[in-house]
Amino acid sequence: MVDLAELRKEPHLSASSVSGYLECGLAYRFGKIDGLAPEFTPDVLVFGSAIHEVLAEYYRSLAQGVRLAGEHLKESFAKQWSERAADNDFIRYKEGTDYRSYLSQGQEMLAVFASQVPVEECTVLAVEEPFSMDLEGLPVPLIGIYDLVIEDSSGVITIVDHKTSAKSYSTAQVDQNFQMTVYQSAAKGNGFAGREILLRLDCLIKTKTPRFEQYYTTRSQEEEQGALKRVLAAWDGISKGVYLPANTGSWRCPGCVYQDACGQWMRGELP
């Protein structure tokens, strides 16, 4: 299996970096080109990382025939959250949230997951598995990591991505998810060519009473080609040094980890 840390040491693109570049080229430049250190760590990033680690543990255990109970997942989350967030002053919490509120929320969400996740007759093929793919016209690899890959009794492959969200996804959000389109293309280039592939978003919804929702979708060859064209277009801009900022007041701005640097750039204090 390829090592994601090693892949990241070399020039590369990923679905998230392409999306980030297209949404705010300036933030991409600050992080990927200039190498500026983030000014803070968003709370949702740390929270999502802890949730992902617990779900990875769940599916690795399931691959061995053991289904972990909700209480185990809650204890595991408490450990993961503590390791990441306890006494971490670099985390910026949204108003009305703190370490303890996220601890409680994460445990509640994972208890809901354990009680609501369907019992599937499937084979777990991969958990947190990195991938790399070559794309014609792209001089660097396109890399990423599958949260989960499963195969059902009829041989259908399902690529699953775990999400935490403040609200349910719309049909358009699911069917137009760029990351999942890239993942399907990568799967075809990494051993699953000619196989029937389904895509699934498993979402833990951060409502007052947490919910667990699964969304299935598929991608056509035309949609795959369109996504890969976006990758090439992003690379073309990056290679030419084009780093357009997002519009002031973009949805990205409140959680951007380069707000001070952006202000300096706007005032002409940074090139």
For each predicted feature, which ranges?
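Short acidic (Asp/Glu) and glycine-rich catalytic loops that position anionic groups and cofactors
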Residues: 28-34, 160-164, 203-214
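Non-catalytic protein-protein interaction segments used by genome-maintenance enzymes to assemble
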Residues: 126-190
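An acidic intrinsically disordered interaction segment
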Residues: 9-25, 140-154, 221-228
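Nuclease catalytic cores
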Residues: 18-19, 23-63, 103, 128, ...
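Metal-dependent nuclease catalytic regions and adjoining charged, substrate-binding loops involved
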Residues: 8, 12, 173, 186-271
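Active-site-adjacent bridging/hinge elements
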Residues: 24-30, 150, 156-161, 232
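A non-catalytic, helix-rich entry segment at domain boundaries
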Residues: 54-128
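Hydrophobic (often cysteine-bearing) scaffold residues that line and stabilize catalytic clefts
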Residues: 43, 47, 102, 142, ...
